[in-house]
Amino acid sequence: MTELSPKQKAFLKSKGQGLEARLQIGKNGLSDSFLKELEVALERDELVKVKVGKFVEETLAVEAASKTRAALVATLGRTALYYRRSKEPKLDLPD
């Protein structure tokens, strides 16, 4: 899992404000297909916003981060923001 400094988290949160949630953790939880989609989205975009379903445990957001080796940048309500540096970095994080 990627460790982020407070400055990096603030930077990523500001970038994430304009993003639409692309994925949703539904009642099926962290299915293999969901995790695969999240892996692809993280590799492609590095920063991914995910909706957490109404009847889903919020701990699944943390579990999804560890299973995909991503950093859980922030959670706000039922939305989680994930970051993982891709092989070809797109975002230039501050130090």
Residue ranges and their predicted role:
Residues 1-95:
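Positively charged, polar, low-complexity stretches
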